[in-house]
């Protein structure tokens, strides 16, 4: 009997080398070589990964927005999603001009190429509250490892800040994670790793939780995970993952969870509601369980 050796392409390295060099400056985050974006005539930073590019216009109100997108290579067709936004672009050579009647989260695809989308993720400005326990300032990079959040604490990411690491909360009633900065996982898991690392935000046994305005990018595993929590509000959050197990939001054994006006790009589950055997002392309490999603956008790739 004749056997042939067959080479199998492995997408992910099962034993990747660990990353030893953290990010030191915001400028070190890779910028898009394909897209330049202007909003109201002002150039915005367009970030790049090997799976998508993204830009985060932070806005103060619901006024219309005018955009110009300059593309560094020729293209034949441009499509905006979701289709119901009905974006009508004027195309001149490699440049597109269009207007959003109100701030929204849209995707630009060129020539049907799903590997080079541009995510335009308009996000409302989140004002800094008077009480902030963990402040991450604009223009700075923070390598936090695991940030432990306690009850009644507020985490605030200013626009232009980049936080590398993950957030963990246990019995952190009244916790808040707010702002318009970026929680980025690219430097604490290897690019080709699948299923490695910890959830980017993990909350267990927490009540009265609010996550608003932040952008989460390229975690090594699940991104936003409330477990055995109740009264959770997720608003205007952007989540973009690359790895195969990079779920967007996993709601595990929770009560009264509301998601609104958020964007999720995932290679696995965008939003997944799960059950788990948490020893919840409130398990026998009579309660109406609600999980509500309003004006959210999801994209599976």
Task: State what each model feature region is.
Residues 1-2, 293-296:
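Short, small-residue-biased leader/transition segments that mark boundaries at the very start
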Residues 136, 149, 155-158, 176-179, ...:
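All-beta strand scaffolds that present successive hydrophobic residues in beta-strands
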Residues 144-146, 164-168, 186-191, 219-226, ...:
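Short glycine/acidic-rich loop motifs that flank beta-strands on beta-rich extracellular proteins
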Residues 228, 238, 253-255, 275-277:
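Active-site-proximal loop/turn and secondary-structure-junction residues that shape catalytic pockets
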């Amino acid at each position: 009997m004749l056997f042939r050796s067959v080479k199998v392409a492995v997408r992910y390295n099962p034993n990747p080398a660990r990353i030893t060099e953290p990010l030191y400056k915001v400028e070190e985050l890779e910028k898009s070589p394909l897209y330049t974006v202007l909003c109201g005539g002002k150039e915005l930073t367009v970030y790049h990964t090997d799976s998508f590019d993204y830009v985060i216009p932070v806005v103060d109100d619901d006024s219309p927005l005018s955009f110009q997108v300059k593309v560094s290579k020729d293209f034949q067709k441009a499509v905006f999603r979701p289709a119901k936004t009905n974006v009508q672009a004027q195309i001149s050579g490699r440049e597109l001009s269009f207007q959003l009647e109100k701030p929204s989260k849209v995707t630009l695809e060129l020539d049907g190429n799903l590997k080079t989308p541009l995510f335009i993720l308009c996000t409302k400005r989140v004002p800094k509250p008077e009480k902030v326990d963990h402040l991450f300032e604009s223009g700075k990079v923070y390598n936090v490892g695991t940030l432990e959040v306690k009850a009644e604490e507020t985490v605030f990411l200013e626009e232009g800040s980049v936080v590398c690491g993950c957030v963990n909360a246990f019995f952190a009633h009244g916790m808040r994670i707010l702002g318009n900065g970026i929680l980025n996982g690219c430097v604490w898991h290897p690019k080709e790793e699948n299923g490695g690392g910890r959830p980017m935000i993990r909350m267990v046994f927490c009540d009265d939780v609010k996550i608003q305005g932040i952008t989460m990018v390229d975690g090594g595993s699940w991104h936003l995970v409330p477990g055995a929590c109740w009264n959770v509000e997720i608003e205007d959050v952007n989540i973009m993952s690359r790895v195969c197990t990079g779920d967007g939001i996993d709601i595990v054994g929770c009560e009264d969870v509301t998601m609104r006006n958020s964007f999720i790009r995932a290679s696995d589950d965008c939003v997944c509601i799960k059950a788990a055997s948490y020893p919840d002392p409130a398990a026998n309490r009579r309660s109406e369980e609600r999980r509500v999603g309003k004006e959210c956008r999801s994209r599976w790739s």
